Amino acid sequence: ISADILARTLERSGVKTEILGFTTRAWKGGQSREQWLNDGKPQNPGRLNDLKHIIYKKADDPWRRARRNLGLMMREGLLKENIDGEALLWAHNRLMSRREDRRILMVISDGAPVDDSTLSVNSAGYLESHLRKVIDWIGRFSQVQVVAIGIGHDVTRYYRRAVTIMDVD
């Protein structure tokens, strides 16, 4: 709902917006985990779940054309686990392909990065550490400004420019 409201508001102000989403393709791993098991479970394997990156609205599409896609966010069974760092890199790369003079990547988050398959065999905090590294890299080397809104979750521990909304009502 918040992405929908923000996109409509920004579009009315003449700001191009893209709405992206991310999740994993499976619970408790997928082909990545199967490959790791087939390889004899090497130590420190990294991500062990397959990513699903979703484009709900492209920047050049008007909100009216994309509004039905926004309903897919709530489709039962679609959203699983969250590998935030790689999703942030994907969104950043999409934004860098745009020609606008100013580029802002706004993250709306309801929780910390979590993927049980990955976290069960890597060091504690693996996904959070990766997210922090990605945010730091973008902040140092990119022209993209990252801002975040936490919905019921304090995102200020990850993002420097962030607000937290505890009660949406």
Regions found by a protein language model. Name each.
Residues I1-D169:
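Acidic, glycine-rich A-domain
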